[in-house]
Every structure is written in structure tokens, then in C-alpha cells.
Amino acid sequence: MPQTFPVEEIKDWIFDLDNTIYPARSNLFVRVAVRITEFVATHFDVPQDEARVIQKDLFQRYGTTMRGLMVEEGLEPSDYLHFVHDIDVSDLPREAELEAMLAKLPGRKHIFTNGTVPHAENILNAYGIRHHFEHIFDIVGADYVPKPEAHAFAKFIEKTGIDPH
């Protein structure tokens, strides 16, 4: 029988951003993926279909396309991150149910994302839920090492002071 833990005793809640804190139906991750493909196509001067093949290969081998471009191409990540996260979020609706659910959770709430802090804030502000999160930990704070790598989690724990036990 699974062990239960009283919700009121949970001190820290950790949320991923993409397709987790916001609904997949928003297509935000798809919007970012389109921008990633555009970046790869421009970087390698190849058509979109070829760029998608390169993108998928880098993602599978390195955990993120960006990490693959950094290792194989010497990419400076800031331009990449700015480009791929430059998406329109003006059509996102306020999510009253999500707002209510977050308001009920005791303890600190954190976002842990392979995106950037500005990208996360852009989305959280659009949904009207930014005020619920004490901390946003991003790929920059993880030294550009993506989740699920152990280094990213160690940096997250170090930065937030969360006791993982």
C-alpha cells in the first residue's frame, strides 16, 4: 500500500514549466520547438526538414538541442535562448482553476525549467500566476546542463536550499 504524506506538511513544491505548469493544449512548447527548428536551419543553412533531423539528433544525444550545439558547434547559448524563447503569449487565457489550486498549496513553490527565467516569467505572468512562485531556476543557473542530468538537480538544490530528503 502506498505511503501517504499530509499535504500540509510539504514545505516545497517543484514544478516543471513546459506542458506541466501550463496545459499542453496551449501549444507553447510547440511554439518554442518551431523557433528551435528555425534557429538550427539558420545556423546550418539548411531547409526546415533537414533542420528538424539535426535538432532531433542533438536533442537525443545531449538532452537539449542547445547543449548539442554548444558541444559540437561551440554555440554561445545566450543568443540561442533569446531567439527560441521569443514567442507570443498574448493569447494565453487566465487559468482560474490553476490559480485556485496553487493558492491552496502550502509551502514554497518553485519552477525548475530547461528554459530561461525571462521565458518562465513571461508565461507565468501571462497566466497571472507568477506571484505564487518564490523561485525560478533555469538552464542558466544549471550551467546550461539540462534536466534530467544530476548536475542540474544538484545546482537546483544548492540554489534553493531545499532538503531533498
For the regions a language model picked out, list residue spans one by one.
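N-terminal helical cap/lid subdomain that shapes the substrate entry/recognition surface
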Residues: 3-15, 20-97, 118
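Catalytic-core regions built around general acid/base machinery
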Residues: 97-106
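Small/polar loops that bind or transfer phosphate-bearing groups
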Residues: 24, 111-112
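Short glycine/proline-enriched coil/turn segments at helix->beta-strand junctions
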Residues: 71-74, 105-109, 161-163
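A general structural motif
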Residues: 7-10, 106, 164-165
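Substrate-recognition "cap/lid" segment bordering the active-site pocket of phosphatases
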Residues: 110, 116-165
